[in-house]
Curated annotation (Swiss-Prot):
Family to which the UniProt record says this protein belongs: Belongs to the TSC-22/Dip/Bun family.
Assembly behavior: Forms homodimers. Forms a heterodimer with TSC22D4/THG1. Interacts with histone H1-2. Interacts with GNL3.
Main function: Transcriptional repressor. Plays a role in the repression of hematopoietic precursor cell growth. Promotes IL2 deprivation-induced apoptosis in T-lymphocytes, via repression of TSC22D3/GILZ transcription and activation of the caspase cascade. Positively regulates cell death in response to TGFB3 during mammary gland involution.
SUPFAM superfamilies hit by this protein: Delta-sleep-inducing peptide immunoreactive peptide
Coiled-coil region(s): none
Cited Pfam families: TSC22
Protein name as annotated: TSC22 domain family protein 1
PANTHER family given in the database record: TSC22 DOMAIN FAMILY PROTEIN 1 (PTHR46745:SF1)
Keywords for this protein: Cytoplasm, Nucleus, Repressor, Transcription, Transcription regulation
Source organism of this protein record: Bos taurus
Subcellular location, record wording: Cytoplasm; Nucleus
Region annotation Leucine-zipper: where it falls in the sequence: 77-98
Amino acid sequence: MKSQWCRPVAMDLGVYQLRHFSISFLSSLLGTENASVRLDNSSSGASVVAIDNKIEQAMDLVKSHLMYAVREEVEVLKEQIKELIEKNSQLEQENNLLKTLASPEQLAQFQAQLQTGSPPATTQPQGTTQPPAQPASQGSGPTA
């Protein structure tokens, strides 16, 4: 019988502390000091203030960790953007080179494949093979 009586009292005390904690926490967030929002000077009031301070410290810690993580992620994304821009530039240069080295027949065949939607895998190795690049290097060889 005694254990049944202690449980409601302990629960009531917990609810009382939680209610005062919630009021204290909300008032600190709102920055208001209303007459209706006051903590008593008892030990429960001091523990509420201590808990309130711990929560604020934890929130500050979480905030600083999140800010650090966001800064790190921004740096990673900036680096990825820089790498993608460089790769895009390189691919554009290669594309322009292949266009200049490809014969008109190869370009026409490639355009036809793009329009029909068939994969350009059969013409792509022909455009990227070494023989078209060799005449260009041979042409620059005698002039040097």
